[in-house]
């Protein structure tokens, strides 16, 4: 839903996409950090979870800074967010926070990826199907 909101934001106010680009990039990175920070607080007394979460965060930071295309970054990041989404479902408070943050992460991500000239919204949704697949498969396994 966050991706849809981001695309709608650019469709409604396309003239704001370029001036807000820098802020969208910072907001996307900050929200991504918060997505990893809240489970860290929840699992604070379990060092194994903290270490796994830190390794996971380092991997996401590596992807963030080494891949050039935002669409390719999004494929990996949203697949990883699907795992966090599933793991947070065990605690309703953490699940509400993580769900909200994943939604909020989708708004600037889609706003940065969407091109009104190219009309690439199918590519955006297809490249982020990893989130739905991972979260759905993890739920049924």
Predicted regions and their residues:
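Hydrophobic, aromatic-rich alpha-helical transmembrane segments
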Residues: 19-26, 71, 91-95, 121
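Membrane-proximal helix-loop-helix units in multi-pass membrane proteins
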Residues: 47-117
